[in-house]
Amino acid sequence: MTASTMALSSPSFAGNAVKLSPSSSEITGNGKAIMRKTVTKAKPVSSGSPWYGPDRVKYLGPFSGEAPSYLTGEFPGDYGWDTAGLSADPETFAKNRELEVIHCRWAMLGALGCVFPELLARNGVKFGEAVWFKAGSQIFSEGGLDYLGNPSLVHAQSILAIWACQVVLMGAIEGYRVAGGPLGEVTDPLYPGGSFDPLGLADDPEAFAELKVKEIKNGRLAMFSMFGFFVQAIVTGKGPLDNLVDHLADPVNNNAWAYATNFVPGK
């Protein structure tokens, strides 16, 4: 393990695929089982990019001060801010970085899923329930919940049926993202490429680096949006578009401050 780590950290391997050969214990039976792991080194981003490197944009601009030594600007979304020291340990940083990117992607999909049905319903498209936090209760209705409105696909009147479908749909994709599959191996679980990039958006390294920054920035906004949707649902019992319409109609009485000052515990 130590030798592999040293080999991967050597600059002479930058940009090349590194193959790790097995030990003798990995050779079993009548034939040889050779296990290889391909590690792809990210191509350096142009020094002119404002989002990477020591001269990148910081969280407070010129008033940010010096960033921690372990925040070098190598990864997208690094603004040099880590007052709690969450990124000081490399292994913890790698884990948290993966968690953030995955949550960003789900939050962007979730925010779209919260707003889009309401938007369609306001434009004449009929839904059983367009408000996101009420939609799940349709499985308890007399007709149940049909995937894509087609009872021959999944006619769900059970939370277990919904759960099973989600495990299959989400678990298969996540498993392929991490471990690869019949369509090809995955060298980077965060940015698998290949079948996950049919448009070839990652073909140009500099454009890809820019897209990574856009993804993490929009994803962070989406996570805050989802938090706001949850709070709105608890406080007002309405969806995000309904709350927006109410606020625009009467911004003085329909805002966060008004609801906070009118809140009485136990009522």
Swiss-Prot record:
Annotated positions binding chlorophyll a 1: W81, S87, E100, R220
Per the record, what is one GO cellular component?
photosystem II
Where in or outside the cell it occurs: the entry states: Plastid, Chloroplast thylakoid membrane
Assembly description:
The LHC complex consists of chlorophyll a-b binding proteins.
Q: What is known of its domains?
A: The N-terminus of the protein extends into the stroma where it is involved with adhesion of granal membranes and post-translational modifications; both are believed to mediate the distribution of excitation energy between photosystems I and II.
Q: Which family does it belong to?
A: Belongs to the light-harvesting chlorophyll a/b-binding (LHC) protein family.
Q: Determine the domain of life of the protein's source.
A: Eukaryota
Bilayer-crossing residues are: 101-121, 153-173, 221-241
What's in the keyword line of the UniProt record? Acetylation, Chlorophyll, Chloroplast, Chromophore, Magnesium, Membrane, Metal-binding, Phosphoprotein, Photosynthesis, Photosystem I, Photosystem II, Plastid, Thylakoid, Transit peptide, Transmembrane, Transmembrane helix
Q: Where does chlorophyll a 6 bind?
A: H247, A256
Quick one: which residues bind chlorophyll a 3?
A: Q138, L148, E215
Name assigned to this protein? Chlorophyll a-b binding protein 7, chloroplastic
So where does chlorophyll a 5 get bound?
K214, Q232
Query: Transit peptide positions?
Result: 1-35
Q: Name one GO molecular function term.
A: metal ion binding
The task this protein performs is described as: The light-harvesting complex (LHC) functions as a light receptor, it captures and delivers excitation energy to photosystems with which it is closely associated.
Where chlorophyll b 1 binds, per the record, is at Y59
- The protein's predominant localisation is plastid
The way it spans or sits in the membrane comes to:
Multi-pass membrane protein
Amino-acid positions noted as binding chlorophyll a 4 in the UniProt annotation, renumbered to this chain: N218
Binding residues for chlorophyll b 4 = Q166, R177
Which residues are chlorophyll b 3-binding?
S158, E174
Q: Write out the residues that bind chlorophyll b 5.
A: Q166, F263
PTM per UniProt? Photoregulated by reversible phosphorylation of its threonine residues.
**What PANTHER family would the database entry show?**
CHLOROPHYLL A/B BINDING PROTEIN
